[in-house]
Amino acid sequence: MKSIRYGVSLIALFALYYLLPLNFRLLWQPDETRYAEISREMLATGDWVVPHFLGLRYFEKPIAGYWINSIGQWLFGHNNFGVRFGSVFAITMTALLVAWLAWRVFRDKKVAVLSPVIFLTAMLVYAIGTYAVLDPMITLWLALAMCSFWGAAQAQSRSGKILGYALLGVACGMGVMTKGFLALAVPVVGVLPWVIARKRWREVLTYGWLAVIVCTLVVLPWGLAIAQREPDFWRYFFWVEHIQRFAEKDAQHKAPFWYYIPFLIAGSLPWLALLPGALKRGWLERDEARGALYLLGWVAMPFLFFSIAKGKLPTYILPCFAPLSILMARYALEAAKTGAKALRINGMINLGVGLLGLIAVLVVSPWGVMHKPVWTKIELYKCLLAAIAFAVWALMGWLAMKNPGRRWSLAALCPLGLALLVGFAIPDRVIDSKQPQFLVDIVSESLQPSRYVLTNNVGIAGGLAWELKRSDIIMFDKQGELKYGLDWPDAQGSFVSQAGFADWLATHRQQGPVSLVLLMDKGESMVDLPLPKPDNAYELGRVVFLQYLPQ
């Protein structure tokens, strides 16, 4: 009965964190609106080979992540839950792999149960795992690679090793088809310390070719299909999205070497106090037969790899949290047995985080010291919801701190208030510029019959296209990440410059209403826009809706 009760509690906790909130949070631009629309177009056109965004060639990523996202919308429909389901599915499968690996490494049921709990409630994992991006998918394939290599290394039979390396090839192949060739580099650097320390080179060289062959066979059908349909894909994807993005001096998202350290620290909440001890114990046990060194290698080596790369984003280190959660779970259970101070300190940290959050809410509220508060006076209920969310965090931290021997696991409940309430507490000023669904809903009666819809922001373009279920959104003045697709001869009608807008409008408005949804710069007003006078206008924060009717 006790195990059944625990099982039901874990399922309920998962539903509260990962299922219930999904449909109640508006989609964020640019990421969620982009991936929502790419998958919608894939379903609408039936083209499962070439990724398109707003009807344009979009070669930022390969195809497999879009497949998973499309299946989510196909199963659950045209809603926010369907858009985000692919990420939740991938991160859930990763958690199950974490549980499997924890059991195979330590043969401890408690470690196997606690590891996915820590993984799913870690802030970085939760934030990305409920957000419609491709990083949860690549994390799934890298976790599968981590598990399959360990399974192959521990197999006692030739058939077991063949199966493990074949599965490794599948994982790497799907990783390549999700995010590119980094899916090959990360497993190599991840296993390197363990292979060197255990002197397993001969086995790797003997069976590694099988993984390479299987990986190639997985990628080959789609790789040849897209090369035939779009011969420029592989050139653009390799040189622009890999070399320029990660290695060159002008790399995209350039950041210093230490960039990921704050994200590792904040991302480990609400289990932060376990981080130093888990890493230290993993290092001290590196010479033991069990897999502490293997797990530590999968944490440290990818972390260093991405730190060395010039282009950086917080989501890149998500795969590090799979092995890290196993090390943290084992350390937490040992600390509970020995009465180590780390569990009390963890409660204190969570209490402090909750209290700091409450103070921050007060500071940025209409009654705070900020000249321009985050929330306005009519958003009192949002301040209250944010305060409740942080109060829950502080309460769970306080309970764990008072009795760390029995209540330390309450840390898993610390982010629950945020998970359930954050979607309702987003300030209006943020919604206006970052969540275009809100504006589209307000002006939908005018937008729906529009013959032409233009916008100067790619993220808003994705939101408009997804909400209106039309891919013919025209970019106005700015091309952004769509420059490559817009440069093709068959895409010339998808962009209108600001200088040529007046002439374009005179030619096209007779065909039907022309609508513009523009994101203005900070401090800019609608009257500052150098545009012809519209027939209808609506301003919402930094976003303005303009409409020109036929004359």
Swiss-Prot record:
Compartments it resides in: Cell inner membrane
Pathway, per record: Lipopolysaccharide metabolism; 4-amino-4-deoxy-beta-L-arabinose-lipid A biosynthesis
Signal sequence, start to end: none
Keywords, in A-Z order: Cell inner membrane, Cell membrane, Glycosyltransferase, Lipid A biosynthesis, Lipid biosynthesis, Lipid metabolism, Lipopolysaccharide biosynthesis, Membrane, Transferase, Transmembrane, Transmembrane helix
EC number(s) recorded for this UniProt protein: 2.4.2.43
Predominant cellular place of this UniProt entry's protein: membrane
GO MF term (any one): 4-amino-4-deoxy-L-arabinose transferase activity
Protein name: Undecaprenyl phosphate-alpha-4-amino-4-deoxy-L-arabinose arabinosyl transferase
Species: Klebsiella pneumoniae (strain 342)
Lineage: Bacteria, Pseudomonadati, Pseudomonadota, Gammaproteobacteria, Enterobacterales
Gene this protein is translated from: arnT
